[in-house]
Regions:
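Beta1-alpha1 glycine-rich phosphate/pyrophosphate-binding loop at the start
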Residues: 5-78, 167-189
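Mid-to-C-terminal Rossmann-like scaffold of FAD/NAD(P)H-dependent oxidoreductases
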Residues: 5-9, 15, 28, 283-340
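Phosphate-coordination loops involved in phosphoryl transfer and adenosine-cofactor binding
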Residues: 7-9, 83, 148-151, 211
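Residue-level detector of alpha-helix initiation sites
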Residues: 16-20, 42, 115-117, 137, ...
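A Rossmann-like FAD-binding core segment of flavoenzymes
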Residues: 32-36, 74-98, 104, 171-266
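Glycine-rich dinucleotide-binding loop and its adjacent helix/turn
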Residues: 113-171, 266
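Glycine/Thr-rich phosphate-binding loops of Rossmann-like dinucleotide-binding domains
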Residues: 119-120, 162-163, 186, 235, ...
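FAD-site-proximal beta/loop scaffold in flavoenzymes
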Residues: 126-149, 221-227, 232-309
């Protein structure tokens, strides 16, 4: 009797570092698999961490941030559906709902829906002129806008916020940073470590407003000032760099279990609590190697590694992801700051 080989369909939702890592690993583990990536955006597989450095003219162009070309993905046999939004998952029937295209079945599903920014929750948040650094096409558009910006306010001294302060100063823009803490990266650094970094920003011309809370954005159609607990700052642009939060809307709707850090719960194989469904990247939580406490919102490198684990296992291979220690480092002003 002739044995019939059935091609398995592995669907990846999300085209960031985790999604592309998952798709590539799945195809490597099972070259015959029908591997599909669905992304609501125009591009996949780039480094969002590099966006501030293009804005600051330290990296010459955005094209250098892409991991590969669209032709490269086609050549590897990965089917990427660009500008195609997945709106629902029926884990029982093993189908996804695609906006404007009905339902599609899957054998294995990998959820890599990434992150959103924590909402600022203040009046004026719907005005034009608020920039959320995330999507590379939007970053390209904003980069042209920066040529005409005279003054900008960066909201919160997150790692991304620190990079944007430096980038805007390098563009010759009057730059203000507001943050409710007493110094930059207060949750991760001591004040004596942050002090020389803050001094280097002041030397670049930045205005630092610590112990200062955002209270609103004002303007008729576009933002013209930022209001704070310490007064008003006139500006042409506000860069919102609030905390990253896991985008779990699709996962919750699919019935995946969400953990204490508000990320999708996974095991060391990146398998979720639902059969046939894996997850990776900024939408999940993983244990810290020392405390074993779940943590969420790591780096693109972590997301890519998690994606490779998820993709390998979804395709039938075996790979484990170990608890993370989270060493980190970043440029801040003229300094490199980091920890472990």
């Amino acid at each position: 009797m002739r044995r019939v080989l059935v091609m398995q369909r592995i669907v990846v939702v999300g085209g960031g570092a985790a999604g592309i890592g998952a798709a590539g690993a799945a195809k490597a583990a099972d070259s015959a698999a029908d591997v599909r990536v669905y992304t609501e955006f125009e591009d996949v597989g780039y480094s969002p961490c590099g966006i501030p450095y293009v804005h600051g003219k330290e990296i010459p162009d955005f094209e250098r941030l892409f991991l590969a070309t669209k032709a490269t993905y086609e050549a590897t046999g990965i089917d990427i559906r660009y500008e195609t939004e997945v709106t629902g998952v029926d884990a029982g029937k093993q189908t996804i709902s695609v906006r404007g295209d009905g339902t599609t079945s899957y054998d294995k599903l990998i959820v890599c829906t990434g992150f959103d920014y924590a909402p600022v929750g203040v009046p004026g948040a719907d005005l034009d002129g608020l920039y959320y650094v995330k999507n590379i096409r939007r970053a390209m558009e904003w980069d042209k806008v920066l040529d005409g910006v005279k003054a900008a306010v960066v909201v919160e001294a997150s790692p991304l916020g620190l990079e944007m302060v430096t980038a805007l100063c390098h563009r010759g823009i009057e730059t203000h940073l507001i943050d409710p803490d007493a110094w930059a990266l207060a949750a991760a650094t001591d004040p004596d470590i942050a002090a020389p970094v803050q001094d280097s920003w002041r030397e670049l011309g930045a205005h630092l407003h610590f112990n200062t809370t955002l209270t609103g954005f004002t303007g008729e159609n576009s933002v013209r000032s930022v209001t704070t607990s310490d007064g008003e700052i006139r500006c042409d642009l506000a860069v919102v760099c609030t905390k990253k939060v896991a985008n779990t809307a699709l996962a919750r709707a699919a019935g995946l279990k969400i953990g204490s850090a508000n990320g999708v719960m996974v095991d060391e194989a990146m398998h979720t609590t639902t059969a046939g469904v894996w997850a990776a990247g900024d939408c999940i939580e993983v244990p810290h190697s020392v405390s074993q406490i779940p943590i969420q919102g790591l780096t693109g490198s972590h997301a890519y590694a998690q994606g490779k684990v998820a993709g390998t296992n979804a395709a039938g291979g075996q790979r484990k992801y170990q608890p993370v220690s989270v060493p980190w480092g970043m440029m801040a002003g003229e300094w490199m700051i980091g920890g472990v």
